[in-house]
């Protein structure tokens, strides 16, 4: 027994010694491990430094990343919109108390429409899909043409923008913003009646194309140049429609930022439609640069120039304003006359900046020229920046020249003030309840007879637009090649995912079933809404 106890005791001692030895070795082992890890990291860093990717590889990787993101974003949105169309159909059928067999027919018809739309998306649109009638607008980055679609002989306005100029002037975000809001304004309930409808957008190697609704009445600027001023009744109507149009844009969570008579189009019935969303931005985003960057070169001290070169008489101001108006409209810089000071100053701003622009337009309609107009952009810029000092004098001069009602003067002054106290800050109802709009039926405004109704001789009548000469023969189309024939570079990245195709428009042009016939005696637009979708990224369509 003693031997056994001694062996047990010895075994226990050896075990304790081994444990102590293990404990003493562990720190050393840890140091070795750390050294090993440090060595491995250094070796990895050295290997990493040796990896150099070419510019072409990096561009291809970025293009692939953007393409995949755009594809799946568009795919999931497409599936959601398809579900929305089905849900909308089911809801409408319930409201109409259709029998089950009738519902089955409508479901099959919608399924057929969806199939036709999917097939039509495979058809590539190009500039050759349209016949050019004439130019109806020209700007710094492109032109607008009245065109006829060869497939169905329908007329559209085609906006064609030069990619290289857009990139050179850093305008790619702006053109994408315009495309996005025009697409967003279409939904299962129909297109927004206050916004010019977008039917297709596509591109080739050199140009971007927006195929939009043709609005034959021209723009408000043309009418103001023609009539000089409007009566208060006419002004009341057009300002009321502009208020509702902007409210519909704000409800989409966008700010227009560039509301001016040039961008207020008049449709064939005389009602307003808003266009040109190049400076439009989201209510909660700063992705579009402030206009202060555009006018930066005109900045100086905050004092008004002691010698203002603006003509003092009203007739002289008329002549001066008309003389420079069109030139400014088509220049790279444009005019700051309608822009809110907080936008120019790069201060924080929201939807209220659009209400400032409405006040400027209202003043112009009643007086004949914008309140801050000057002989130079610099003078205009400084007058806006110092509006608290300049506006009182401007209003006094206007009252001496024009018989402004107290209600009109009050509304203008409540538009042209600080954002926090500007009318509309507390909601559009604040504007609608102003005494100037007494008697306006806001709910039936688009059913009210407008002051000016365009007199049109034909669907191709462009008499309400300026005349433009063809500068040169239209450039031949340069199709966007497939990836196997043409490498995508950084030049293409800003335009990936630009393609858009309206659901109803594609079916009308390329489908075999007429949307009105498909729903029998029920008008599809009235009963089921105008249905739209975005086109996903399809190979080289980008």
Curated annotation (Swiss-Prot):
This is Probable serine/threonine-protein kinase ndrB. Residues 130-437 form the Protein kinase domain. Keywords: ATP-binding, Cytoplasm, Kinase, Nucleotide-binding, Phosphoprotein, Serine/threonine-protein kinase, Transferase. Residues 1-52, 452-486 are annotated as: Disordered. It is found in: Cytoplasm. One of its GO terms (molecular function) is ATP binding. PANTHER family: CHROMOSOME UNDETERMINED SCAFFOLD_135, WHOLE GENOME SHOTGUN SEQUENCE, MYOTONIC DYSTROPHY S/T KINASE-RELATED. Residues 9-18 have a biased composition (Low complexity). Disulfide bonds: none annotated. The active site is at residue 258. It comes from the Eukaryota. It holds the Pfam family Pkinase. Residues 438-510 form the AGC-kinase C-terminal domain. GO terms for biological process: intracellular signal transduction. Its EC number is 2.7.11.1. Residues 455-465 have a biased composition (Polar residues). It is an enzyme of class 2 (transferase). Its main location: cytoplasm.
């Amino acid at each position: 027994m003693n031997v056994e106890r001694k062996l047990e005791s010895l075994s226990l001692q050896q075990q304790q010694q081994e444990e102590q030895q293990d404990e003493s070795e562990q720190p050393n082992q840890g140091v070795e491990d750390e050294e090993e890890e440090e060595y491995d990291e250094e070796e990895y860093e050295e290997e990493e430094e040796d990896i150099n990717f070419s510019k072409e590889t990096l561009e291809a990787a970025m293009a692939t990343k953007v393409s995949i993101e755009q594809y799946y974003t568009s795919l999931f949105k497409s599936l959601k919109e398809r579900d929305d169309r089905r849900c909308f159909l089911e809801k409408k059928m319930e409201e109409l108390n259709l029998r089950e067999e009738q519902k089955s027919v409508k479901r099959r018809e919608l399924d057929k429409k969806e199939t036709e739309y999917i097939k039509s998306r495979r058809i590539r649109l190009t500039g050759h899909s349209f016949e050019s009638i004439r130019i109806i607008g020209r700007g710094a980055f492109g032109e607008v043409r009245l065109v006829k679609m060869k497939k169905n002989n329908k007329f559209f306005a085609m906006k064609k923008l030069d990619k290289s100029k857009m990139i050179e002037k850093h305008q790619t975000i702006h053109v994408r913003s315009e495309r996005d809001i025009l697409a967003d304004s279409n939904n299962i309930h129909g297109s927004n009646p206050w916004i010019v409808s977008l039917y297709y957008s596509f591109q080739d190697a050199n140009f971007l194309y927006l195929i939009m609704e043709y609005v034959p009445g021209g723009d408000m600027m043309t009418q103001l140049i023609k009539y000089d001023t409007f009566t208060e009744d006419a002004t009341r109507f057009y300002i009321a429609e502009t208020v509702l149009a902007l409210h519909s844009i704000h409800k989409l969570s966008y700010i227009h930022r560039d509301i001016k008579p040039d961008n207020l189009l008049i449709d064939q019935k005389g009602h307003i439609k808003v266009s040109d969303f190049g400076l439009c931005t989201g209510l909660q985003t700063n992705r579009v640069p402030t206009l202060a960057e555009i006018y930066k070169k005109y900045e100086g001290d905050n004092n008004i120039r002691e010698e203002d070169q603006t003509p003092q008489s009203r007739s002289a101001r008329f002549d001066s304003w008309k003389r420079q108006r069109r030139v400014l409209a088509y220049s790279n810089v444009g005019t700051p006359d309608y822009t809110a000071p907080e936008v120019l100053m790069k201060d924080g701003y929201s939807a209220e900046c659009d209400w400032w622009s409405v006040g400027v337009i209202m003043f112009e309609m009643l007086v004949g020229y914008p309140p801050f107009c000057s002989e130079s952009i610099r003078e205009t810029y400084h007058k806006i920046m110092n509006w608290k000092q300049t506006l009182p004098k401007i209003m006094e001069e206007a009252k001496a020249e024009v018989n402004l009602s107290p209600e009109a003067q009050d509304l203008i002054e409540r538009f042209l003030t600080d954002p926090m106290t500007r009318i509309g800050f507390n909601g559009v109802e604040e504007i609608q309840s102003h005494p100037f709009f007494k008697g306006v039926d806001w709910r039936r405004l688009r059913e009210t007879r407008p002051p000016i109704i365009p007199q049109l001789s034909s669907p191709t009548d462009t008499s309400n637009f300026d005349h433009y000469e063809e500068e040169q023969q239209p450039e031949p189309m340069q199709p966007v090649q497939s990836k196997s024939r043409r490498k995508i570079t950084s030049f293409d990245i800003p335009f990936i995912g630009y393609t858009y195709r309206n659901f109803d428009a594609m079916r009308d042009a390329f489908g075999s079933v007429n949307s009105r016939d498909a729903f029998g005696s029920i008008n599809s637009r009235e009963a089921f809404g105008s249905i739209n979708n975005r086109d996903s990224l399809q190979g080289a369509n980008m």
